């Protein structure tokens, strides 16, 4: 649904219950979109979220294939270097 239709739908729904203006509804939509973008940005850069790492990062490094390419976590590369070191 386009932004204009979504805004119009929200305005019509909210105007039945409250005395909000079209500008109030637009401001609310923009606020929610900013919050969603910030939450997505935080989720990508938050080091406390281990689920964003590939599953092999949480496994035993000795049991992994040392030639396997891993992406996404610096820790996995460090572990891989330790496994490959002579």
From Swiss-Prot:
Compartment(s): Host cytoplasm; Host nucleus
Gene Ontology annotations for the cellular component aspect, listed alphabetically: host cell cytoplasm; host cell nucleus
Site (Binding to TAP1 subunit) location in chain: 22
Chain segments carrying region Active domain: 2-35
Chain spans, region Disordered: 33-86
GO annotation terms (biological process): symbiont-mediated suppression of host antigen processing and presentation
Keyword tags: Early protein, Host cytoplasm, Host nucleus, Host-virus interaction, Inhibition of host adaptive immune response by virus, Inhibition of host TAP by virus, Viral immunoevasion
Residue ranges with Basic and acidic residues bias: 76-86
Compositionally biased spans, kind Polar residues: 62-71
Oligomeric and partner information: Interacts with host TAP1 and TAP2; these interactions inhibit the loading of peptides onto MHC class I molecules.
Function: Plays a role in the inhibition of host immune response. Binds specifically to transporters associated with antigen processing (TAP), thereby blocking peptide-binding and translocation by TAP as well as subsequent loading of peptides onto MHC class I molecules. Empty MHC I molecules are retained in the endoplasmic reticulum and ultimately directed to proteasomal degradation. In consequence, infected cells are masked for immune recognition by cytotoxic T-lymphocytes.
Domain remark text: The N-terminal active domain blocks peptide binding to and peptide transport by TAP.
Family indicated by similarity: Belongs to the herpesviridae US12 family.
Name the UniProt record assigns to this protein: ICP47 protein
Lineage: Viruses, Duplodnaviria, Heunggongvirae, Peploviricota, Herviviricetes
């Amino acid at each position: 649904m386009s932004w204009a239709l979504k805004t119009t739908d929200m305005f019509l729904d909210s105007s039945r219950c409250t005395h909000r203006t079209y500008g109030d509804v637009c401001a609310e939509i923009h606020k929610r979109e900013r919050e969603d973008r910030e939450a997505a940005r935080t989720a990508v850069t938050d080091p406390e979220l281990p689920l964003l790492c590939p599953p092999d990062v949480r496994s035993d490094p000795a049991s992994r294939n040392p030639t396997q390419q891993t992406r996404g976590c610096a820790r996995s590369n460090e572990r891989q270097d330790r496994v490959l070191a002579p």
